[in-house]
UniProtKB/Swiss-Prot annotation:
Name of the protein: Prokineticin Bm8-d
Family (UniProt): Belongs to the AVIT (prokineticin) family.
Keyword Signal set for record: yes
Source organism: Bombina maxima
Cysteine pairings via disulfide bonds: C26-C38, C32-C50, C37-C78, C60-C86, C80-C95
Amino acid sequence: MKCFAQIVVLLLVIAFSHGAVITGVCDRDAQCGSGTCCAASAFSRNIRFCVPLGNNGEECHPASHKVPYNGKRLSSLCPCNTGLTCSKSGEKSQCS
């Protein structure tokens, strides 16, 4: 049982270490793969995940920074994929 507790503590330390990227959790775009950005969680701006860039017809944020962005994104939406723009469509914006 003591060994199990030590393993759990070790995994928690690794998961919350600065710069650790586990299961898509990130801090900056550079930690994500091609075609993705490091977007804020819709539930907490302190948690960010690697999210795919927007495709045609998908929701976007018109003021989103280009990829790669060196700062921390505040939006839960990535910018549109190459060749697409984020345009207002009704009350929401979409990649087109």
